[in-house]
From Swiss-Prot:
Positions bound to [2Fe-2S] cluster: 35, 41, 44, 60
InterPro entries recorded: 2Fe-2S_ferredoxin-like_sf (IPR036010), 2Fe-2S_ferredoxin-type (IPR001041), Corrinoid_activation_enz (IPR052911), Raco-like_middle (IPR041414), Raco-like_middle_sf (IPR042259), RACo_C (IPR027980)
Organism per entry: Eubacterium limosum
Induction record: Up-regulated during growth on proline betaine or L-carnitine.
Function: Involved in the degradation of the quaternary amines L-proline betaine and L-carnitine. Component of a corrinoid-dependent methyltransferase system that transfers a methyl group from L-proline betaine or L-carnitine to tetrahydrofolate (THF), forming methyl-THF, a key intermediate in the Wood-Ljungdahl acetogenesis pathway. RamQ is not required for the methyl transfer, but it stimulates reduction of reconstituted MtqC from the Co(II) state to the Co(I) state in vitro. It also stimulates the rate of THF methylation.
Protein name: Corrinoid activation enzyme RamQ
Cofactor(s) needed for function: [2Fe-2S] cluster
DNA-binding as UniProt keyword: no
Gene Ontology molecular function: 2 iron, 2 sulfur cluster binding; metal ion binding
Domain 2Fe-2S ferredoxin-type: 1-76
Keywords tagged on the record: 2Fe-2S, Iron, Iron-sulfur, Metal-binding
Gene3D superfamilies referenced in this protein's UniProt entry, alphabetically: 3.10.20.740, Domain of unknown function (DUF4445)
Length: 593
């Protein structure tokens, strides 16, 4: 059965029972299945042409038919992904190195061993290689016609020998930050420490759900489902590897080291380990240590003898992305609160001696998902909202007609509504005399479900002629998300034994944290506002940490030790959780416990 993608000028063969969302994912267009393909979120609406009739369908519920045309585009799947990180001057002493030796120096004296000669020529400790490497060594040691023997070493272990007439052999590595929504890869020449380029794209696992719980549920359906979601992340990584190598004009087989960070669910799915027990109390994973594989153990297009390392996890849903962020923080006694404003809402408090960490399960609302007109940070998303002299102002990604709100836009919009007296401290839209007296009263409306909404952009203001609204339900979703984050900050600090006034810096990590208006976030009670305590955004802190691990043997060792100074706290078991959480659903700059 043939299915066509006119906007891509492509067509593919599919099986009869395929869903539109599955077909889109197979061609590299993973749609935003926030609800895990259950048909509830309605974020995967797509136009199709079937039997000559154009219609809008839910991709996760609608089956393809022969000759169907699906009008999905790369832009529909593209989003505003943060690639930049805060460190530009990274230390350089990589785990993987290349030593280039002259064949003329490989002279074995009487009654000695070739490997001992090699060890004397390499200025570091060399352990006995694996059998396959030792066998390869015996084959290349006496080769004629070559001037140089390049020896690739990972840690203290030789992983490859390359006979050559070239004086030097450049080798490359990639540091990856695997997010629930997006994946970023940084390509380095690890003979020089030079960043060559970087590339990002959506995590193709988004076709199986927009959050970790949806993906845990899907993977837990059986081995076939687990393998499909494993293949999705491998395809994502393979595309990034191919793209960065193409841009740098290098062979993917010259990639000898890759390093990965991501939350605990991403780690399990990367390793094709069933994450079922992560989704059930007491939220246990298989292993939190750094895990190393060989390239040949994966379908990734790197050198099969190269190293593949997933950084260590910290406990529960707090994974290697948080470990990576902590690795990139200054190693001093300054007391910090670190907040990663993503779907899992990881939080850490402490200093270089001791950290407490927790995840807050704040949901996808702060990333624009799960809202009536929420969307990823892509073209058409409102990213900034304000009000000047009674007139609502906004800016749109791509400077096009507005389609909905991304995370930073929804925070600004809620702050504006609260500041202008359009919602009360408890989150209710105003009504009665307060509504009648308000100059923006005509922007309110009621939908078919008798739910009130407010028009941030009216149909008359929008070139596409549609209202862009925030409903009462959307306000509640933001209240729950911000309460989760703020409660996490309060209880984690209390468990650590400090008050808000003891903090010396608040650090915001992640893509959303980089785009958010900090003052608006503090105004609605999403972020703590503590007098004299600065708030600093570090961009993609997880990406910085992954690069540190790639480029420095010492940093990798420090990273592997972070779990030993870190205590994971399960916030939901704290006796104060419910009371604190309910208090923090209120809008306003709350006071930390």
């Amino acid at each position: 059965m043939r299915v066509l993608f006119p906007l891509l000028e492509e067509e593919i063969d599919v099986s009869q029972e395929s869903l539109v969302s599955d077909v889109c994912a197979s061609i590299g267009l993973p749609l935003n299945l926030v609800c895990g393909g259950k048909g509830r979120c309605k974020k995967c609406l797509v136009n199709v042409k079937e039997n000559g009739e154009m219609k809008e369908v839910l991709a996760c519920q609608y089956s393809v038919s022969d000759g169907m045309e699906i009008y999905a585009s790369r832009e529909q799947a593209a989003s505003q992904i943060l690639e930049t990180s805060s460190n530009s001057d990274l230390p350089f002493d990589p785990i993987v190195k290349c030593y280039s030796l002259n064949y003329t120096d490989l002279v074995t004296p009487m009654c000695t061993y070739d490997l001992d000669v090699l060890r004397k020529l390499i200025p570091q400790t060399i352990d006995t290689p694996d059998y396959s490497v030792l066998k390869h060594f015996s084959e290349v040691y006496f080769l004629e016609g070559y001037e140089r023997l390049h020896v690739i070493v990972s840690g203290n272990r030789i992983i490859d020998f390359i006979p050559s007439n070239e004086k030097e052999k450049p080798i490359y590595g990639i540091a990856f930050d695997i997010g629930t929504t997006s994946v970023v890869g940084y390509l380095y020449d690890i003979t020089s420490g030079c960043l060559l380029n970087q590339h990002s794209m959506l995590n193709k696992q988004i076709a199986f759900g927009g959050d970790v719980i949806s993906r845990i549920d899907y993977a837990g359906e059986g081995p076939e489902s687990l393998h499909k979601i494993y293949e999705a992340i491998m395809e994502t990584l393979a595309e990034i590897i191919t793209q960065v190598c193409k841009k740098a004009s290098i062979d993917t087989k010259d990639i000898y080291q890759t390093v990965y960070c991501g939350n605990s669910t991403m780690a399990h799915l990367f390793l094709e380990l069933n994450p079922k027990h992560l989704g059930l109390a007491p939220f246990l994973g298989f292993c939190k240590d750094a895990i190393s594989l060989k390239g040949m153990d994966t379908p990734l297009p790197i050198n099969p003898k190269g190293t593949v390392t997933f950084m260590p996890l910290l406990g529960g849903f707090v994974g290697a992305d948080t470990t990576a962020v902590l690795l990139g923080l200054p190693r001093d006694k300054k007391m910090r609160l670190m907040i990663d404003l993503g779907t899992n809402g990881e939080i850490a408090v402490g200093n270089c001696d001791k950290y407490y960490v927790a995840s807050t399960a704040c949901g996808p609302a702060l990333e624009g998902a799960g809202l009536t007109m929420g969307m990823r940070g892509t073209t058409g998303a409102i990213e900034k909202v304000g009000c000047e002299n009674g007139k609502i102002t906004y800016s749109v990604i791509g400077k096009t007609a507005p389609q909905g709100f991304c995370g930073s836009g929804i925070v600004d919009a809620i702050a504006m509504l609260f500041r202008e007296g359009l919602i009360a401290k408890r989150g209710n839209f105003i009504k009665g005399d307060a509504l009648d007296a308000h100059p923006m009263k005509n922007r309110f409306g009621v939908d078919e479900n008798n739910q009130r909404y407010f028009k941030i952009v009216t149909a008359g203001e929008n070139p596409e002629g549609k209202d862009i609204i925030i409903t009462q339900k959307d306000v509640r979703a933001v209240q729950l998300a911000k309460a989760a984050i703020y409660t996490g900050c309060c209880l984690l600090s209390e468990n650590y034994g400090i008050k808000g006034s003891d903090l010396e810096e608040i650090v915001i990590a992640g893509a959303f944290g980089n785009y958010i208006d900090v003052h608006n976030a503090q105004f609605i009670g999403l972020l703590p506002k503590i007098e004299g305590v600065p708030v600093r955004s570090i961009g993609n802190g997880a990406g910085t940490g992954a690069q540190l691990y790639l480029l420095s043997k010492e940093e990798a060792g420090i990273c592997n030790a972070i779990p030993r100074i870190t205590t994971h706290i399960e916030l939901a078991t704290d006796p104060k959780f419910v009371e604190t959480y309910m208090m923090n659903t209120m809008f306003g700059d709350n006071v930390m416990i």
